[in-house]
Amino acid sequence: MSGPLTERRQMILKLVIQEFVDTATPVASETLVRKYRLPVSSATVRNDMAALEELGFLTHPHTSGGRIPTDAGYRFFVENLMERTTLSPAEQRMIRHQFYQVRGELDQWVQLACAVLARTAHNASVATAPRAEQLRFKSLELIAIHETMALAVIVFHGGIVKQQTLPIEPGRTPEDLRRAAGLVSDLLADATLSRAEELAAIATFNGVPLSEFERTLVDLVVRAMSVFEEQAQEQIYSDGILEMLSQPEFLPASGRDDAERAIERLRRTLEILKSGRGLSPLIPQALASGGVQVIIGGEHSEDTMRDYSVILARYGVEGALVGVLGVIGPTRMAYPRSISTVRYIASLMTNLLADLYHVNTRPSDIEPAAEL
């Protein structure tokens, strides 16, 4: 029988994880007793490690006398044993300064976030560009550019603007265009794509059927929203592939089989980061959460992700723009460091977007970043 998970066994599990993360080598009981000066014998520690193995928190590689953590062991560590840490003040200042250099340049924030995450967490990083949580229509304006052509300016909440030309009948006055655009703006006010499609099918406003031209304008808006939603599927940016590939997991130990396994893992890693396959299902979960998400090894639904841990956090301004950022690496990961890095960068990006939109962010379990 494995017995209870006593305080001492929890301490030993924590030390095994700490040692394995540092060395990438299976941990022996003698190592823990000697290095950490434990007040018990190596035989006692060995018995506790055997109990932890029976509980599913450690495993015993066939080629070694030591033990390594399982996914369940890492999960218990993250939820129960890990001490919450923060980046040092010097690191925070350095990171804030880098973002200050591109302040107001939204398109560069994501790339910079990826670079900083990879360098600080010593693993690969991933991020999505900020986008509207759910596209909502705001207004429509029609501008005559020719007697048979008008420019439709479609505005969505979050500052997103789409422009498109459309043919008009000769003789339509600017007042006709203004009136039709105003009616459509009132009809579709704050509508999501699904709601706009419903209103287009009903084709009435205040009980009065829409004219053919007004129906054309509604259909134009619906098509623009549909195209935007399709194009706005999260593109996943990444950085730090060399940081990740420097980990021992990607280096062959000896022999042809080891080399082939290392090459296959390298190929799979590059495919994950290039295509986003395996990561894409995690994005909606992270967007729906207000905190840091940690997915460890076998917890992934995708088989290709079973050797990796992913730490993600949402950033952005609710009701305006939101995105996701995080790190990916082997399950043998420095979880406290990685989590604190993801949490800090997400908070900093949230503050930057809040400043851009002149709103106050609501409290969350993501630690606040100091002002730039």
UniProtKB/Swiss-Prot annotation:
Signal sequence residues: none
SUPFAM superfamilies cross-referenced by the UniProt entry: GAF domain-like, Winged helix' DNA-binding domain
The UniProt keywords, alphabetically, are: Repressor, Stress response, Transcription, Transcription regulation
What GO biological process term is on the record, naming one? negative regulation of DNA-templated transcription
Matches recorded under InterPro entries = GAF-like_dom_sf, HrcA, HrcA_C, WH-like_DNA-bd_sf, WH_DNA-bd_sf, WHTH_transcript_rep_HrcA_IDD
User: Which Pfam families did the record assign?
Assistant: HrcA
Q: GO molecular function, one example?
A: DNA binding
Which domain of life does the UniProt lineage start with? Bacteria
Supply the Gene3D superfamilies for this chain.
3.30.450.40, Heat-inducible transcription repressor hrca homolog, domain 3 (3.30.390.60), Winged helix-like DNA-binding domain superfamily/Winged helix DNA-binding domain (1.10.10.10)
| Recorded family membership | Belongs to the HrcA family.
- Cite the NCBIfam families for this sequence: hrcA
| UniProt-listed PANTHER family | HEAT-INDUCIBLE TRANSCRIPTION REPRESSOR HRCA
Write out the function statement from the record. Answer: Negative regulator of class I heat shock genes (grpE-dnaK-dnaJ and groELS operons). Prevents heat-shock induction of these operons.
What name does UniProt use for this protein?
Heat-inducible transcription repressor HrcA
Species, as recorded: Chloroflexus aurantiacus (strain ATCC 29366 / DSM 635 / J-10-fl)
